[in-house]
Amino acid sequence: MKPNIHPDYGPARIICACGNVIETRSTKKDIRVEICSQCHPFYTGSRQRVVERGGRIERFRQKYGR
């Protein structure tokens, strides 16, 4: 590898909207995600629906009142 052309690779934190924090390594310091393995229904086994920010159709209807 050529010296001094690669980004710094160091400790990073992945922060989920549920409050879970995962320590890892990356070229970015903090990474924010909406869902992780602690709150995703597939991993938790719950059948509840995931809270969404709104799909494209719903946002269109809100914007144009249809």
Swiss-Prot record:
One of its GO terms (molecular function) is structural constituent of ribosome. InterPro entries: Ribosomal_bL28/bL31-like_sf, Ribosomal_bL31, Ribosomal_bL31_A, Ribosomal_bL31_sf. GO terms for cellular component: ribonucleoprotein complex; ribosome. It comes from the Bacteria. Pfam families: Ribosomal_L31. Coiled coil: none annotated. The keyword NAD does not apply. One of its GO terms (biological process) is translation. Its cofactor is Zn(2+). Keywords: Metal-binding, Ribonucleoprotein, Ribosomal protein, RNA-binding, rRNA-binding, Zinc. Zn(2+) binds at C16, C18, C36, C39. Transmembrane segments: none annotated. The keyword Ribonucleoprotein applies. Binds 1 zinc ion per subunit. HAMAP family: Ribosomal_bL31_1. PANTHER family: 50S RIBOSOMAL PROTEIN L31, CHLOROPLASTIC (PTHR33280), LARGE RIBOSOMAL SUBUNIT PROTEIN BL31C (PTHR33280:SF1). Part of the 50S ribosomal subunit. Belongs to the bacterial ribosomal protein bL31 family. Type A subfamily. Binds the 23S rRNA. This is Large ribosomal subunit protein bL31.
